[in-house]
Swiss-Prot record:
Keywords: Acetylation, Heme, Iron, Metal-binding, Oxygen transport, Phosphoprotein, Transport. The modification Phosphothreonine is found at T28. It comes from Sus scrofa (Pig). GO terms for molecular function: heme binding; iron ion binding; oxygen binding; oxygen carrier activity. GO terms for biological process: cellular oxidant detoxification; hydrogen peroxide catabolic process. The zeta chain is an alpha-type chain of mammalian embryonic hemoglobin. Residues 1-141 form the Globin domain. Heme b binds at H58, H87. The modification Phosphoserine is found at S52, S72. This is Hemoglobin subunit zeta. The modification N-acetylserine is found at S1. Disulfide bonds: none annotated.
Length: 141
C-alpha cells in the first residue's frame, strides 16, 4: 500500500495532471500503440491515427479512471470494480497491456511534468499504477 508521503505526491500531481487529462490520455494511448502495436487488436473499430476523435475520447476515459483511482486512493478496488469486470469478462484484455499502459503514462507524465516527476514522485506513481493495474486484472484470477 501507499505511504502517506506517496499519497500526497500523487494527489498534488493529479491536480496539475487533471487540467490536461485529455491531452495526456491521448498521448499515452498514442505512445502505447506506437510502442506496443499488438495493443491495437483490442480496438478494431477505432480510428487509431494520432489525434483521432476516438483516440482522444478513449484517452479521456483512461485518465478519468485514473482520476477515480486517485480520488479513492484508499479503495482503488471498489472505485474500479466495474472497469475491472468490463476488461476481464467482456473485452478480455491481456493483463500485460495494463503494465504497458502504465509505462506509457509514466513516460507521458515525465514529458509534461519534468520538474514534478522526481525520482520519489516517479516511484510513487509507479507503485500507484501497479496497484491500479492489479485491480484491473484481479478478476482474471
Amino acid at each position: 500500500s501507499l505511504t502517506k508521503a506517496e499519497r500526497t505526491i500523487i494527489g498534488s500531481m493529479w491536480t496539475k495532471i487533471s487540467s490536461q487529462a485529455d491531452t495526456i490520455g491521448t498521448e499515452t494511448l498514442e505512445r502505447l500503440f506506437a510502442s506496443y502495436p499488438q495493443a491495437k487488436t483490442y480496438f478494431p473499430h477505432f480510428d487509431l491515427n494520432p489525434g483521432s476523435a476516438q483516440l482522444r475520447a478513449h484517452g479521456s476515459k483512461v485518465l478519468a479512471a485514473v482520476g477515480e483511482a486517485v480520488k479513492s486512493i484508499d479503495n482503488v478496488s471498489a472505485a474500479l470494480a466495474k472497469l475491472s469486470e468490463l476488461h476481464a469478462y467482456v473485452l478480455r484484455v491481456d493483463p500485460v497491456n495494463f503494465k504497458f499502459l502504465s509505462h506509457c503514462l509514466l513516460v507521458t507524465l515525465a514529458s509534461h511534468f519534468p520538474a514534478d516527476l522526481t525520482a520519489e514522485a516517479h516511484a510513487a506513481w509507479d507503485k500507484f499504477l501497479t496497484i491500479v493495474s492489479g485491480v484491473l486484472t484481479e478478476k482474471y484470477r
